[in-house]
A protein has these predicted regions:
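Conserved SAM/AdoMet-binding glycine-rich loop
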Residues: 99-103, 111, 219-311
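Proteins enriched for Cys/Gly/acidic motifs involved in redox and nucleic-acid/cofactor modification
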Residues: 1-236, 256, 301
Length: 311
């Protein structure tokens, strides 16, 4: 099995059918356990897509799997205890069959990299939050090595737009709705949130890539999309600042997220548009206007009100 070429931008979104799994009964299989937020859920879809592109098939349970991926969260209560408890359980699971592997991905793997590497030592691999897209290459390296493989960044940085979660193949759980990543990282420093430390600075995905993906999703029968980011209503700020620093005086600051809502909502076949999560300090009248004037944008806000606390 060769390592997957991760420089491609194949944004395939079709769910793999159960019959395809049956036909590939002799292939190595995987299970993914996901903890935490919608970003992690979408990351897991992409990890699954990459693993299947590399020849693995989805197993119905851990008992049937050769590879278990634990995609972790470090925000939810007792997340670390759940992870380390699972690693303890999986130690006996791994011993029952030669060639089994455990890969730890996500925010907790980034935050507690040394501890995770030590606890997952019997398992085979560990990836930080930015390295979910390297799941297939990580799996191959761990499979052919006698020692644990870890690939956890000192700083959470993704500098290639081709490595955005939504720019990679996915195995989606449903055929009618889809996550669409528009941004990763966050430039805020809220006392209650550790996300900037594990997912890095804000980085907006190119506008055209997002709209193109939504068109592709609609052509495949998706009717509902959720735009994902740590602070979606600051989307595009970094793109425009970069253009202005490069001498483009026409790159005026404008409400790019409001524009994005309108353009995504106008895609033929898309009936519902949601987004999460906005930040109160970056919510602008233009965004509310776009919500009111775009029928497909749902009348719903997921608001982190604790960010307004002065305690």
């Amino acid at each position: 099995m060769s390592a997957l070429n991760l420089t491609r931008t194949d944004a395939s979104v079709a769910s793999t059918s159960k019959s395809e799994h049956v036909e590939a009964a002799d292939a190595r299989s995987y299970v993914i356990r996901t903890y935490g937020c919608q970003m992690n859920e979408h990351d897991s879809e992409r990890i699954a897509g990459l693993l299947e592109s590399d020849g693995l098939v989805r197993a119905e349970s851990e008992d049937d799997a050769d590879v278990v991926v634990l995609n972790t969260c470090c925000i939810r209560e007792n997340a670390d205890n759940k992870l380390y408890g699972n690693l303890g359980h999986l130690k006996s699971w791994k011993a029952k069959k030669d060639g089994r592997q455990i890969v730890v991905s996500g925010c907790l793997a980034q935050k507690d990299r040394d501890t995770v590497a030590e606890r997952a030592g019997h398992g085979g691999g560990g990836m930080g939050a930015p390295h979910g897209p390297r799941a297939a290459a990580q799996h191959e390296a761990a499979r052919t090595s006698d020692t644990p493989i870890t690939e956890i960044l000192e700083a959470a940085v993704v500098d290639d737009h081709a490595m955005f979660p939504s720019a990679l193949p996915a195995r989606r759980e449903t055929s009618y709705d889809a996550w669409v990543t528009i941004q990763i990282g966050c430039d805020n420093s809220c006392a209650f949130c550790i996300v900037p430390a594990v997912r890095g600075e804000e980085m907006s995905r190119p506008y055209g890539d997002i709209v193109d993906e939504v068109h592709q999703l609609a052509s495949q029968g998706v009717t509902e999309v959720t735009l994902l980011g740590q602070n979606v209503n600051s989307y595009g700020r970094d793109l425009q600042l970069a253009a202005r620093r490069a001498g483009d005086d026409t790159a005026k600051l404008r409400p790019l997220f409001a524009d994005l809502l309108r353009d995504v909502g106008a895609v033929d076949g898309i009936r519902r548009v949601r987004f999460t999560s906005p930040h109160p300090k970056d919510m602008r009248p233009e965004t509310f206007a776009a919500m009111a004037e775009t029928p497909s944008v749902c009348e719903h806000l997921h608001y982190p009100l604790q960010s307004g606390s002065d305690e």
